[in-house]
Amino acid sequence: MLHSSAMVNSHRKSMFNIHKGFYCLAAILPQICICSQFSVPSSYHFSEDPGAFPVATNGERFPWQELRLPSVVIPLHYDLFVHPNLTSLDFVASEKIEVLVSNATQFIILHSKDLEITNATLQSEEDSRYMKPGKELKVLSYPAHQQIALLVPEKLMPHLKYYVAIDFQAKLGDGFEGFYKSTYRTLGGETRILAVTDFEPTQARMAFPCFDEPLFKANFSIKIRRESGHIALSNMPKVRTIELEGGLLEDHFETTVKMSTYLVAYIVCDFHSVSGITSSGVKVSIYASPDKQNQTHYALQASLKLLDFYEKYFDIYYPLSKLDLIAIPDFASGAMENWGLITYRETSLLFDPKTSSASDKLWVTRVIAHELAHQWFGNLVTMEWWNDIWLKEGFAKYMELIAVNATYPELQFDDYFLNVCFEVITKDSLNSSRPISKPAETPTQIQEMFDEVSYNKGACILNMLKDFLGEEKFQKGIIQYLKKFSYRNAKNDDLWSSLSNSCLESDFTSGGVCHSDPKMTSNMLTFLGENAEVKEMMTTWTLQKGIPLLVVKQDGCSLRLQQERFLQGVFQEDPEWRALQERYLWHIPLTYSTSSSNVIHRHILKSKTDTLDLPEKTSWVKFNVDSNGYYIVHYEGHGWDQLITQLNQNHTLLRPKDRVGLIHDVFQLVGAGRLTLDKALDMTHYLQHETSSPALLEGLSYLELFYHMMDRRNISDISENLKRYLLQYFKPVIDRQSWSDEGSVWDRMLRSALLKLACDLNHAPCIQKATELFSQWMESSGKLNIPTDVLKIVYSVGAQTAAGWNYLLEQYELSMSSAEQNKILYALSTSKHQEKLLKLIELGMEGKVIKTQNLAALLHVIARRPKGQQLAWDFVRENWTHLLKKFDLGSFDIRMIISGTTARFSSKDKLQEVKLFFESLEAQGSHLDIFQIVLETITKNIKWLEKNLPTLRTWLLVNT
């Protein structure tokens, strides 16, 4: 799964501790080998203690008290029939689950949520007591755990197979989970309905009763009944269609490979598709609503190239004969990797050359690469439990880098990947962060695991490990991991083992030597030892939270190194600082270069302090070469002065990514109280000579951040001087920008950012040009093709008049391009009139003109503006209960709404206001991790202003 960030630019102690053992039933059932990682008691039966178990909805005792399912009954195969009615907006369904019983039991526990069970029966071909068809079962329901219990009249016997048949029905969901309805508007204005599934992480149980945990892998045979005007899609190819009475059709699909329930998918719609064949014969199809079929061609081209790449890179063929990618009009996340039927938000799959910018193209390519990587990481090899969600999400995010670089080098994603790491450092440098791998049991806790730590930090430590091991060894290791655990589940240690012993069978059959390959000298560290070495190093990154700070002090030819925990908003002089540093130690794979040599030196820092000797005297040392390491670097003494001097004299002597890293680190260190703000601002002087777009954008992003912070606080003297400084120093590069789509991807992204900044600062030439283009666009009735990279800027300037704002809202409703709608919605949110902003929010809540899927991002962008910040926050407080009816408590949307409307506050009054609101929620969410993150972020903002406001004011007076 990937969360959408297109409009904003942009997952306890276990209640059920299973002692993991290994058993295999092959000896008893030679025709079946079911190997799993469970241990079970000798039998399951009712407790005589009436207080030991919860109470079912009918008042009887429910026979199971844990959140996790018992492992005594293992699903092997589901026969699932579904008939959705797109008129009455409900569905009827039935299933027959083949299960294997490992120990005697009186009950079967499954997951089920909001389903009406109308009948349940049991049959067995191996147990004589259940050979007669239709032995009816009593069904108990315990909604608090989203579980049902099927009570059997006589104990099920060990090592026998049974068939559980269940009939059930439900309404199609109004939200974005389970089996739900989505709508779209045709060019002619007609509203049409489709039925779609989205099951990750714990919503398959909303569509059919099942063993809804990733460890319970099974095969699925799916049948879908539909009307003739619709098509049905599922994970596997359709094998036949049966005509029924009344004009209905029933599609039967091939049985799936063995997989987890969260990957099951089926859709009934009237979409059209374009198709192609990969070099290995896989049919790839892109589906979209009929009027948007012309926007699917880039996705098809990219999918074919990326699937071919992954098959070669992983040395494993994609195991299905087809792969469908479909753009869903209502979709909460960016995309979902259902095996063979990947679902996408429209902005993550469709590309319209007339309205999609360079950034849009990069986003679509990344999301496709991410979801295709999941067909191996996540689908073929699945984490044992959601605490290790990073094993699939971190890898998929990392594989975006590898795959996009290989297939579309012109998109220059290698440079952009730095932002993936910089984004998560903001959160990971707070004390309220969490380890990558963290216990999660409830559905809400599991949903909270889908966050920047699992995705971005997971990807960044994998990139660091690849740089440490070397590309070839790392690739061999992940190939071994995928081959060894295909169609199975894995945990952290399994990955470290594969990366430590990355010998493939081919290495030995060809007579190769793997464990001490002499070819791997550039990145292979001679002291990298056995299995425990990689595990020992990487557990310091996955099992403890936070990010290390490397403190470097140069003394002649000697470097004194020290590692600390890097914390934003907690300063060394604060009383709590020392306690927050205790027990934190990372094994950091360091890299560094010097002014005297381009050679990349390597060292692992395993202790709190260490000393390195340089071979020759050097004027400066730069650690974390190309920012491949996940750590911040602080140069004590004259270290920063020497680097800033070098940037001003000849910045090209430092590598482009190193310049980006220096800008990032220097401003991060200001937030941690380790550097004064004037030192960081002095570094920005060199940017007027910078030609690397990533470095320019990194520096500008901090200056723009400070400007908007002052603007929101109405500190007008500083905001005006910052505006003057920005236009004074960057006017030449702003004025060089053409209002076109010319140049490389980075040229185009720089153009968008610079012109947006110029118009935000009311730079007269920018406002004049944007106004001119907007007027021409209105006069052409929206037919004029404005260059895509400046489209958002033109719309934003146009939205500042009443006529322009109203016209944009009309065009938003009419547009057939989701990329254009995103740009229009952003522009509408920049209005300075609060009644217009409130109208947008109300339309988002209603969900007709502005789809509810966009509400969280809309509130986020509105809150970024001075006129919208308090408005958005007040709306959230007043409508919290209504918001929880639209989005799950721990969902990405709720977390974005909370952080987006509060995290920019920077006063003690607002901190208290937010804190009191969170405390008032109690069961409605006061326990969410995001609340502590927000409170700490606001505190950090307050301390930043207290410490740096006088310095910023003085520095600007001197430099403008």
UniProtKB/Swiss-Prot annotation:
Membrane-topology annotation of the record: Single-pass type II membrane protein
Disulfide bonds: 421-460, 759-766
Swiss-Prot/TrEMBL cofactor(s): Zn(2+)
Enzyme class: hydrolase
Gene Ontology terms for molecular function: metalloaminopeptidase activity; peptide binding; zinc ion binding
Annotated transmembrane regions: 21-40
Annotated Zn(2+) binding sites: 370, 374, 393
The keyword Ribosomal protein appears for this protein: no
Intervals, Cytoplasmic compartment: 1-20
GO terms for biological process, alphabetical: adaptive immune response; peptide catabolic process; proteolysis
UniProt main location, coarse: endoplasmic reticulum
Active site: 371 (proton acceptor)
Cell compartments where the protein resides: Endoplasmic reticulum membrane
Protein modification: N-glycosylated.
Binding residues annotated for substrate, in chain numbering: 200, 334-338
Keywords: Adaptive immunity, Aminopeptidase, Disulfide bond, Endoplasmic reticulum, Glycoprotein, Hydrolase, Immunity, Membrane, Metal-binding, Metalloprotease, Protease, Signal-anchor, Transmembrane, Transmembrane helix, Zinc
Residue(s) at site: Transition state stabilizer: 455
Pfam families in the cross-refs: ERAP1_C, Peptidase_M1, Peptidase_M1_N
E.C. no: 3.4.11.-
Record-level GO cellular component terms: endoplasmic reticulum membrane; extracellular space
Listed SUPFAM superfamilies: Leukotriene A4 hydrolase N-terminal domain, Metalloproteases ('zincins'), catalytic domain
Function: Aminopeptidase that plays a central role in peptide trimming, a step required for the generation of most HLA class I-binding peptides. Peptide trimming is essential to customize longer precursor peptides to fit them to the correct length required for presentation on MHC class I molecules. Preferentially hydrolyzes the basic residues Arg and Lys.
Subunit structure: Heterodimer with ERAP1.
Family that this chain belongs to: Belongs to the peptidase M1 family.
Protein name as annotated: Endoplasmic reticulum aminopeptidase 2
Organism name: Pongo abelii
Gene designation per UniProt: ERAP2
